[in-house]
Amino acid sequence: MNDIERLEKEICLALEAASDEQTLETVRIAALGKKGCISEKLKALGKMDVEERHKVGPVLNGLKNRVLELWVQKRDLLRRQAMNKRLSRETVDVTLPVRSSPLERGRIHPISQVIEEIIAIYANMGFSLAEGPDIETDYYNFTALNFPEGHPAREMHDTFFFDVDKTGERKLLRTHTSPVQIRTMEKQKAPIRIIIPGKTYRMDSDATHSPMFHQVEGLVIDKTSTIAHMMWLHETFCKAFFEVPSVKMRFRPSFFPFTEPSMEVDIQCDRSGSKVKFGEGQDWLEILGCGMVHPYVLQNVGLDPDVYQGFAWGMGIDRIAMLKYGMPDLRAFFDADLRWLDHYGFRCFDMPAFFPGLRNE
């Protein structure tokens, strides 16, 4: 028994002294391999008498199990140490250097800025936000909005159509955010007061048009809304958005399939200088389209036009951003030019504040 105790101490010391897995494996083989010292003693059990074998056998098996357990613990420890060394050696600092000023950590795109401004203004007037899919069906984009068959907007030169799918349906990229009005009226009971900012798509590209552009539409549905309410709403929005105490607006007759009567709205401005100034001057600039929701549209969503009425409007976010902040070319919005963004972009503290003294100039 003394030999077994001495052997266990020697093996334990060898395991503790092992500094790498290769040395540790050598110790294991020397103890538990086919010709290892413990294995040889286990083989010798067959030559002992029964009484002695019953005494020595459990002791050797216990030794074998303890050595194996110590070996596993030591192996796991060496592996963790090796991994930590490797991680320390291969560490790459992916963080950016500290900027000189916390205000220079990035710029907010003008479109994002203007969308937040629009949402803040209308939210202050009791409107909620609505959203819908960019890929639409013909029904929601045209039919439900009173676009008759053969309407020019259905033609390929104006609308991005997808190939016909397995069901025989031909979907498209929405040409306006008006489909969200239909989806909202189908799901939500009146009264309804929503604004719908989002991306829209049309085949057009020049200095003031883009195949993908941003639009915001609004919808009011109840039993009492009139054109007078609509006119007040547009005037209030323009004063808040362009930050002027008063504006003059004119409403010109127009045509939209989904409104009747339909109007286009011009706002008074001064274009004599390099930047458009609102609330003064003798010029007029078209700013949005609007009108009372067409009775056929109300019928398409299950509303009785003899009971319910309302108005809708829409404007290009990119366009009013250009007008407010003096950007000459719409295409630069999507060029991903950091120099342009650094010049026209906004800091986080610029979003949005409509009260004197709160702007971070």
UniProtKB/Swiss-Prot annotation:
It catalyses: tRNA(Phe) + L-phenylalanine + ATP = L-phenylalanyl-tRNA(Phe) + AMP + diphosphate + H(+). CDD domains: PheRS_alpha_core. It is found in: Cytoplasm. Signal peptide: none annotated. One of its GO terms (molecular function) is tRNA binding. It comes from Bartonella quintana (strain Toulouse). This is Phenylalanine--tRNA ligase alpha subunit. One of its GO terms (biological process) is phenylalanyl-tRNA aminoacylation. Its EC number is 6.1.1.20. Mg(2+) binds at residue 260. SUPFAM superfamilies: Class II aaRS and biotin synthetases, tRNA-binding arm. Keywords: Aminoacyl-tRNA synthetase, ATP-binding, Cytoplasm, Ligase, Magnesium, Metal-binding, Nucleotide-binding, Protein biosynthesis. HAMAP family: Phe_tRNA_synth_alpha1. One of its GO terms (cellular component) is cytoplasm. Binds 2 magnesium ions per tetramer. Its cofactor is Mg(2+). Tetramer of two alpha and two beta subunits. Belongs to the class-II aminoacyl-tRNA synthetase family. Phe-tRNA synthetase alpha subunit type 1 subfamily. The keyword Isomerase does not apply. InterPro entries: aa-tRNA-synth_II, aa-tRNA-synth_II/BPL/LPL, Phe-tRNA-synth_IIc_asu, Phe-tRNA_ligase_II_N, Phe_tRNA_ligase_alpha1_bac, Phenylalanyl-tRNA_Synthase, tRNA-bd_arm. It is an enzyme of class 6 (ligase). It holds the Pfam family Phe_tRNA-synt_N.
